Every structure is written in structure tokens, then in C-alpha cells.
Amino acid sequence: VYKRQVLFDFGLSSPQLDNASRGFSFRLEAPLDMRMDNSQGLSAKEWLQTVEEEELAKVIRDFGEERYFKRVAHAIVSYRQQKPIETTKELASVISKVVKVKERGLHPATRTFQAIRIKINQELKEIECVLPEVLDLLSPNGRLVSIAFHSLEDRIVKRFLQENSKPISLPKWVMMKESELGLSPLKILGHPVKASSEEVALNPRARSAIMRVAEKVARK
């Protein structure tokens, strides 16, 4: 069954973040879990207890875009040699001792928590896998709407839309339009949209949200 519209709202939901037992928030004391599905895979606590320092640093750098990734990785590994990191606030405390934050309102543990969560749940791989499936789901002129909350998610969406909406130059002797050849399945609509100041005032978590919209090209 074709869909007229597919909406992706990537990342954590507020109920997940505000549920202390899930272990996503550094502001709420809880067991260090971070799994979207806590019946599958390693918890953040289990992963942090065994991961090599070099791999941990790479995860924090690539998925958290943390400037002090080496410093944080070393602090975590050094701490765990004394005892396992059991809770969210315990991990946040370890990170806070080695990270200097210049951005107003940003907690020192923000980027590292994001990185570990993305790694534990394979979030970016999930996005890369699901986006191509939309091409078969959408009806002609159907809309793909994506809302991403950080640059890593948005980068994947942006690249996917660009790759599937590239204009193709046809030789002059080809007496057909691009739309008739079944090329470029998507058309990007408008520019990326960010939350207004009014919306951010009502929902501060929307401050980093970016929405992109594309339409499936109807074939003749």
C-alpha cells in the first residue's frame, strides 16, 4: 500500500528522555542503560566496562562531535579501573571533570551522552537503512518529511535527498524528458526549516530541530 506521506521524527522522544529508568539523561539519577529496547543488546554500562579507550574516543569524536574526546575517553577508562560506572550521574561527573564548555546552557556531558546513546542503539545506521525504503513506499507526489535534532542525523538525510534528486543532463539526441526515464525519484521542496523563536520558547528541545521535505516525482 502506497503512502501519501511519511514523517520521520528522529532521535529520542521527550517521554523517553524524561523517564529516569531509561538512563538517557545525565540530569536524572538512574542505572546507565540508554537502550531504546532494553531487552536487546548491551547497556551503556556494559559497553563502557569493556570498550577499548581508542574505540571509545572515536565514538565520542564521531557521534558526539566532542572536542575533548581523547580526554573524556581516558577519564572514563581510568575511572572504570577502580570501579564500574553504574549510573547516569556517575558518568556525568566523570565527564564534567575534564570537559570545558563554552556554549551557554550546554552541560559538559551532553555530547558524550549523545555519542554513547547513538553507538548503543546504532541510530545512524538505522536512518541509513530506512530512508531508501521510503522510495518504494511513497505514492507519486507523496511527501517525505524529516525532522532531525542534531547535525549527524540531518547530514544523512541531506545527503540522501541530494543523491536522489540530482538533475541529470541528457544528450541532445535523447528525445525524452528526465521524468519519463524514471530518474531522480525525489524533488526537494523549499529550504530546510528551523523552529521559530516562539516554538523554541514553548518547547526548548526544538531549538536544534531541522525539517526537510521532499516529494516523490510522478512518472508519465
Label every model-predicted segment.
Residues 3-220:
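S-adenosyl-L-methionine-dependent methyltransferase catalytic core, i.e., the SAM/SAH-binding region
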